[in-house]
Amino acid sequence: MNMEEIVALSVKHNVSDLHLCSAWPARWRIRGRMEAAPFDTPDVEELLREWLDDDQRAILLENGQLDFAVSLAENQRLRGSAFAQRHGISLALRLLPSHCPQLEQLGAPTVLPELLKSENGLILVTGATGSGKSTTLAAMVGYLNQHADAHILTLEDPVEYLYASQRCLIQQREIGLHCMTFASGLRAALREDPDVILLGELRDSETIRLALTAAETGHLVLATLHTRGAAQAVERLVDSFPAQEKDPVRNQLAGSLRAVLSQKLEVDKQEGRVALFELLINTPAVGNLIREGKTHQLPHVIQTGQQVGMITFQQSYQHRVGEGRL
């Protein structure tokens, strides 16, 4: 089977990830579980020669690893991670939906579109690896593209979803290809007149600092973070800084944060996967807790904040049960 046929078969079986190893049979992940794939492993190095340019191949050779994305036939796009291991080169491939999903299709909290109308501030999407953060960010961009007149600038590693400008002008930059780092790209973005900045990941204190500055100075910043809950996201941001900087960062975050959307995926009754959400909205009470370093109280605030649109994972689970999905 060629790669296009393998991907078509994977889509048919609701595969989320493909694992192609030079020395072992191919495997794929379905509903979160690894299984043997019913095809022979293609020549990984031949695939990389076809997919990567000279600069990317040089990076892979020098660093022993490379993140990239590639488009195949019929609008199918893959996010790839190539890495060297003791038997040769391996590929981990994430299948991306061929079309940008809508927030309603994801079952995202109904207050989210209202939050996206903010003219400035920081909205975080958090969760474990493979929890669908990139898909949710793509749905947010898709919503803005249909409902707002704005300039959206994305910084991604790699570029995953491809957007066609509709009401919005959308410009996508890839780390390592169009700019060297998230921090350098974000620093440049402040001079490129964006209304909305999408950051694929808040990786370090410099990027976090620049993101908070952008959020304070008239930009809506959408970004992801690898944490399993909203309160942990706030703690993670603050803990990225040395002790003497934590209080100023708390003050900055208390003023600029708009919301934290955390998510995870569960296997549903239809043998698919369904997203559960936790949403923290930065009300005056939440801002005070962040400013005072009392993030341990945020879970209780979320639990009692339904009247303003907040939701816990447990409440999201019960909603999915009511829908018949779980």
From Swiss-Prot:
The record's Gene3D superfamilies line, in alphabetical order, gives: 3.30.450.90, P-loop containing nucleotide triphosphate hydrolases
**Keyword Transport carried by entry:** yes
Keyword annotations:
ATP-binding, Nucleotide-binding, Transport
Source organism, top-level taxon: Bacteria
InterPro entries in the cross-refs: AAA+_ATPase, P-loop_NTPase, PilT/PilU, T2SS/T4SS_dom, T4SS_GSP_E_ATPase
Q: CDD domains this protein is in? A: PilT (cd01131)
Which SUPFAM superfamilies does the record match to this protein? P-loop containing nucleoside triphosphate hydrolases (SSF52540)
- SMART domains assigned: AAA (SM00382)
KW Transport (keyword) present: yes
Q: Where does ATP bind?
A: G127, A128, T129, G130, S131, G132, K133, S134
Which Pfam families does the protein's record reference?
A: T2SSE
Disulfide pairs here are none
Question: Which Gene Ontology cellular component annotation is one that this UniProt entry carries?
Answer: cytosol
Q: Which family does it belong to?
A: Belongs to the GSP E family.
What is the official name of this protein in its record? Uncharacterized protein YggR
From the broadest rank down, the organism's phylogenetic lineage runs: Bacteria, Pseudomonadati, Pseudomonadota, Gammaproteobacteria, Enterobacterales
